[in-house]
Regions:
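Membrane-proximal, proline-rich intrinsically disordered regions
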Residues: 17-61
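Conserved, well-structured interaction surfaces
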Residues: 30, 37-42, 46, 53, ...
């Protein structure tokens, strides 16, 4: 009898524990909910905005900042492993990889995102076209800005525009023509999809004016005497 009672108690204890440890984490969102609504998609895009200030170590204006490694910049004694050079490269490509993944997920979940964009609790702007394409325009602008920054430092760099695995295949450096064709295509898409203006909590997000301003900067750089001497006279004319 005691053995039967013990077996019953043990089975009850095991049954009562079932599902107890299968709870969703309270400090992070499960991946399956990342793009199930417009607001969920917007939160992912917001990550890019939040990280935009970290790709170049921010602005260090206090005299308390001391970076002995930067002393190599004066005599131009920098190498590919110097901290400032390595960080600039790796941080921008980490940012680009994040943008590539977000773009892929936005495209995959476009239908469900567009369906409930009108019920957003985070974005009260009037969106006349596809809400997903608007978000993609913002992301493509931010990714293009990262590539433009890399080009200004290094010239042509590998153009990686799709998510890659842990060990991506070797990608050769893009030519100047390839770089600017990519940048202009990205700006054209963003100019078409982004909104005219933003206000309230959305103030600071990419607008058509921001895209036009950045596009002008890219074209001036493209036509500069240092980078494209044959176009310099045309720019002045």
């Amino acid at each position: 009898m005691k053995k039967i009672l013990l077996a019953l108690l043990t089975s009850c204890a095991l049954v009562s524990c079932e599902g107890y440890f299968d709870q969703l984490p309270k400090t992070e969102l499960p991946s399956e909910t990342f793009y199930t609504s417009y607001d969920a998609a917007l939160r992912n895009v917001a990550i890019l905005y939040a990280n935009a200030g970290h790709v170049n170590d921010g602005i260090m204006t206090s005299d308390r900042f001391m970076m002995p490694s930067l002393m190599n910049e004066g005599p131009f004694d920098l190498t590919s492993t110097s901290g400032s050079v390595l960080n600039l490269w790796s941080k921008h490509y980490a940012y680009i990889a994040q943008a590539n993944l977000i773009l892929e997920r936005l495209e995959t979940n476009k239908e469900v995102i567009d369906e409930n964009a009108g019920h957003s609790a985070l974005d009260k702007a009037t969106i006349t076209g596809s809400a997903t394409e608007m978000l993609m325009g913002e992301v493509r602008f931010l990714r293009a800005y990262a590539y433009f920054t890399l080009y200004r430092y290094y010239g042509g760099v590998p153009l990686i525009i799709e998510p890659t695995g842990p060990k991506p295949d070797y990608v050769p450096r893009a030519t100047r023509q390839e770089m600017f064709k990519f940048l202009y295509d990205e700006m054209a898409y963003a100019l078409d999809k982004c909104l005219d203006n933003r206000s309230g909590i959305a103030y600071g997000r990419v607008t058509k004016g921001a895209v036009a301003g950045m596009l002008a900067k890219m074209k001036i750089f493209h036509a500069s005497y240092i980078r494209r001497a044959e176009m310099y006279g045309r720019k002045q004319d």
